[in-house]
């Protein structure tokens, strides 16, 4: 099982240089979880870059090409996300700098006791377990 952050999805869908590593990690997972907040963020980024039709590619990747479980943002995650922001939030921790969507991914990983697949250095400055 793994939780996937928006950054990893965007790397794959935008065919960034490290896309293959993220795609391989997703293919190897027996269960894929993503916060509804992170789906929303990914959709916004893709739409801003490629127009409204980019949402179709996102849904196809999540639900046809892969079997992602889109997890609603609930009270337990909200509490964990707020605690994460208090420790690692943008403007609080100069190394982690987590934003709202990052905190949602962090919270889902913590509440599900699962590693997180992400791109970049923000999560490496936290206590979250990384997938790769």
For every predicted segment, state its role.
Residues 23-24, 60-63, 86-92:
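Glycine/charged-rich beta-loop-alpha catalytic/anionic-binding loops adjacent to active sites
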Residues 69-115:
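Active-site neighborhoods of divalent-metal-dependent phosphate/nucleic-acid chemistry enzymes
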Residues 4-5, 34-35, 98-99, 132:
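Histidine- and aromatic-rich ligand-binding microenvironments
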Residues 106-132:
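Acidic, PIN/NYN-like endoribonuclease modules and their adjacent C-terminal/linker elements
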């Amino acid at each position: 099982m793994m939780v996937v952050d928006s950054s990893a999805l965007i790397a794959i869908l935008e065919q960034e240089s490290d896309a293959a590593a993220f795609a391989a990690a997703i293919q190897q997972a027996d269960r894929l979880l993503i916060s509804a907040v992170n789906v929303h963020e990914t959709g916004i980024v893709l739409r801003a870059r490629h127009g409204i039709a980019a949402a179709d590619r996102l849904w196809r990747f999540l639900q046809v090409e892969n079997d992602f479980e889109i997890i609603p943002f609930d009270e337990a995650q909200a509490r964990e996300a707020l605690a994460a922001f208090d420790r690692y939030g943008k403007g609080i921790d100069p190394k982690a700098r987590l934003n709202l969507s990052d905190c949602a991914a962090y919270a889902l990983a913590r509440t599900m006791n699962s590693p997180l697949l992400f791109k970049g250095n923000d999560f490496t400055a936290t206590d979250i377990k990384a997938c790769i």
